[in-house]
């Protein structure tokens, strides 16, 4: 069973636009924003990649790490590692990009481990390495930046109840009506005091690519 408190390490075949391989373990102490995308996904090109570039420009990389994950579950012959290198250079992606490792099934390993539904998917980890957000689709810029900043305020060893207080204050400050009509599917992995794992689901039907279940 997937546990956001101890999420699995990334399983990748290589890195592009990075001097050395990265791991979630090595990135602990920073907030990590991971964008899973495909080169031929319209939603990735129109929204997710430009958004990730804006986040990289606005946040201090010593505090917030932006990384990409090329998770190919379709058109494998076209979206090769060599094509990705050209893509990263041509579109001037300012962050490292990992290639999700294939395992013979349609869905690559990291994508399957995190139960992603397709691309674009955005995963946000706190300073302690816990998965705190899982977005499928197109989260709003302001909402996303506010959530990243809230996580950046937390200390690495921040108690869970202290983190929950910040989460509640953030939720109260955001316009919930606007939030509920956003173009995304959101899993909130914050564990509150009064429940298990809360899931606030918003379904996006605009431009994202859905992955087929493994083995199909």
Predicted regions and their residues:
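N-terminal "domain-start" segment that seeds a small globular fold
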Residues: 1-25, 95
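Short active-site neighborhood of thiol/selenol oxidoreductases, capturing the structured segment around
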Residues: 22-48, 52, 66
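Active-site acidic short loop of glycosyltransferases
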Residues: 28-30, 61, 93
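Structural recognition of the beta-strand scaffold that forms the well-ordered cores
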Residues: 35, 65-68, 96-99
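Structural microenvironment flanking redox-active thiols in thiol-disulfide oxidoreductases
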Residues: 46-91, 102-108
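Thiol/disulfide oxidoreductase modules built on the thioredoxin-like
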Residues: 91-93, 101-147
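Short, solvent-exposed cationic patches
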Residues: 149-175
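Histidine-centered metal-binding segments
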Residues: 170-216
């Amino acid at each position: 069973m997937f546990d956001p408190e101890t999420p699995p390490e990334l399983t990748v075949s290589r890195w592009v636009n990075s001097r050395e391989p990265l791991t979630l373990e090595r990135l602990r102490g920073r907030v990590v924003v991971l964008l899973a995308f495909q080169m031929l996904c319209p939603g990735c090109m129109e929204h997710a990649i430009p958004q990730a570039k804006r986040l990289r420009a606005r946040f201090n990389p010593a505090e917030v790490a932006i990384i990409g994950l090329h998770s190919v579950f379709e058109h494998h012959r076209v979206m090769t590692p060599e094509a990705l290198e050209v893509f990263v250079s041509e579109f001037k992606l300012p962050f490292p990009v990992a290639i999700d490792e294939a395992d013979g099934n349609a869905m690559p390993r990291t994508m399957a481990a995190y139960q992603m539904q397709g691309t674009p998917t955005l995963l946000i980890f706190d300073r302690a390495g816990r998965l705190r957000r899982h977005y499928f689709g197109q989260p709003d810029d302001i909402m996303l930046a506010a959530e990243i900043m809230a996580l950046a305020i937390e200390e690495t060893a921040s108690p869970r109840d202290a983190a929950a207080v910040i989460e509640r204050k953030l939720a109260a400050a955001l316009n919930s009506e606007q939030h509920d009509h956003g173009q995304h599917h959101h899993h909130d992995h914050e564990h509150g005091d009064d429940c298990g794992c809360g899931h606030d689901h918003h379904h996006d039907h605009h431009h994202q690519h859905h992955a087929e279940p493994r083995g199909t």
